[in-house]
């Protein structure tokens, strides 16, 4: 393995290894996995130019900082179903989760460590993201959080079941698979991109108009000054 930025050196030798945040799908005759792509900034991924923080974070045990992520979403198979498993922070990215469905996922799963939020609104808001992902992609979702809330969502984003925060529990639910790919899954956050483009055009137009008006006013002021003389 090459000594690239995410690689970690093994002992004092010339061997290197990667660390991943991964989802496993274990069946009776198969083991599949995917590695988290959307790494959490500062905790799982830091810019290469800030590489000096890598050693600090590893020493202090505060952050990983050098995880290796997959380049794109990967769908896993279980029986007749294709599974899209979003890992923690990835569930906040609608377009990314939609890419699972565009690749054939008929069910979505979210696995997350929400313990570091503590008893704050953070874990509640993270739970709500799964509702949006269900609606955007018309997929049922099973969500598993180590400290809660875990739950099941139907294709309309309705909560079918949910656990309480920080209480041990086990829940079971039948979910309906869907193979139809929504417009959102195909095209992503097109509305936000259009909004950015329109905002950029309006901003440039406003700047250009302001400069033209400034030039006109300056010429008018000079003309008035000359007439007075």
Residue ranges and their predicted role:
Residues 186-213:
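Selective detector of the "anchor" transmembrane alpha-helix that sits immediately C-terminal
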Residues 217-229:
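Cytoplasmic C-terminal tails of single-pass
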Residues 163, 169, 212-213, 219-220:
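Short leucine-rich amphipathic alpha-helices used at interfaces
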Residues 1-191:
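Soluble catalytic domains of enzymes that build or remodel membrane lipids, polysaccharides, and related
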